[in-house]
């Protein structure tokens, strides 16, 4: 078990060494589009995907996200119980994306999507069946009750509102609720951090829904858990009143709550002690400190999406 514990520490160190962080992000901001592509291909995207990269931005975005998922799913073999379930649910946000894409194809028609996100512990790994009906999807999900209900409730919402957007909205909200429910089974410190993270996710969604998808305020507020004690309602009103998307994103990214959450040194009080005790042989064999893992998974998620936004900006500059 001690060797397993050492492997977990080694994995975290190796992934942090290769991962994205504030310094690398600032460096990438100074590069042109081609420079960012080359850096990510050589340093972040997994070797097995590098030869599959195409020139278009969509391919790059896909393999950046897929590499993130494959790397972070490696932690699941070292985690147990509620901790393992929480990280798995966190990563399965992309399974919710897969399900929404499949349902869009079934409802609206079109070609079956080729680039779904398949990673160890995903609902569909290693291959997605060729679904053609809702019943086929529900049958496939019969052992995954939470995700089966997401599809059922999302489809009911689509039929009631007669607009596909509301299917996705319902499924996204149900995934967030599932993540929050799973966080309640964790240490209270972690639950509080998740609540703060969710409060910022709601505001980011408000920016996306209002400024990108052009939904009205009623639709935006329907997604948000207004009972979240850490929700900054003043910031929410500010981003909804922003004149454009860029201003809304800047308001969100520069907000005190988001900056504090991003910079929160979760390791100073826990993981440093964890590593010291491991060296002295005083730690229970097989234990892995959860907060550094969650911090890494969360921060990589943030920097991945920030980088993709940066790539899209660089493409626009070159047009």
Residue ranges of model-derived segments:
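N-terminal domain-start signal
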Residues: 1-319
